[in-house]
Swiss-Prot record:
Transmembrane segments: none
GO biological process: pantothenate biosynthetic process
Binding residue positions for 3-methyl-2-oxobutanoate: D43, S44, D82, K111
Protein's name in the database: 3-methyl-2-oxobutanoate hydroxymethyltransferase
Gene Ontology CC: cytoplasm
Molecular functions per Gene Ontology: 3-methyl-2-oxobutanoate hydroxymethyltransferase activity; magnesium ion binding
Keywords: Cytoplasm, Magnesium, Metal-binding, Pantothenate biosynthesis, Transferase
Family matches, as PANTHER family: 3-METHYL-2-OXOBUTANOATE HYDROXYMETHYLTRANSFERASE
Keyword Transferase appears in the UniProt entry: yes
SUPFAM superfamilies found in the cross-reference section: Phosphoenolpyruvate/pyruvate domain (SSF51621)
Amino acid sequence: MKSVLGFKKAKVTQEKISMVTCYDYTLAKIINSTDIDCILVGDSGGMVLLGKKNTTYTTLDDMQFMTQAVANGATDKFIVADLPFMSYRQSLETTMQAVMALIQSGAHAIKLEGSSGNLDIIKHIVDSGVPIMGHIGMTPQFINSFGGFKVQGRTEEAAKHLLEEAKLLEQAGCFGIVLECIPANIAKDITQNLDIPTIGIGAGSNTDGQILVLQDMLGMNTDFQPKFVKKYIDGSKLFSDAINTYVKETKANTFPTKEHCYDYC
C-alpha cells in the first residue's frame, strides 16, 4: 500500500488491511521486507521504546526521532505518525507546526485521537494536503479522563456516541479510523456505516483491518498481555536465550571461533 488510495480500494474490495507499529530503523527495515500494508509510528513508542509511563509523556521531539528512523528503514511502506498529546490542542499554529514536523520527518499521513474539538483542525489539515486518520474508543491520550485503560462503548448510549464520532470524523475528511478496545458488535456496526476503512485493535474481526503493537505480537513484553493481543512468537524468551548463549560461549572461550577471526595477510 503506497497511499491513501490503497485504503479506499481495500474498503471497496473488502481486502483486509494489515498494520503494525514501529519506532526504530532496524525493525522498520525488517517490516519493509514483509507484506504489511501500513506502519504506524505510534506515540506508544514513548512507552515501548523509551519506557515512559503512558503516551501523555511522549513529546513531539520523540515522535520526530522515531518517525525519521522508521522512514529511513521502511522506504517502501505507507507511514502514519501520531500527533502527540496536546500538540493539536494549543493553537492552530502549533498544530500545523507539529504536522509539518512529522511529514518532513518522513510520515505520509497523520493520526490524532478523538473527535470533540478536533473536527475543524482535521478539516484544516486535510485541506492543507495532509491525510488524516482518526482514532476513537479507548484513546490512550485520554487515560486520565478514562481512569485507566478501559474498554469503551459498553452501554447503548456510549455505543451510539462512538458511531456519531466515527461519522463526524469521516465527514471532516479522515481517510480511515482506528477503533480501539470496543465491543466487536459495535465495531461491526460502525464499519458497516462508514465509507472509509476502520482499523481495529481490540475491536473484533469485523473491522476493515487490524493493527497491533509490534513488540506485543512478537512477545517481547512479558508485563503487558491484554486479551486482544496474539503472540506470534515468544520474542522475550528467544532473545533472552540467544543472549545467555552468547554469555556462556564467551565465558567458556568457545566464542569467537576461527570463522569469526581475521587472518594475518
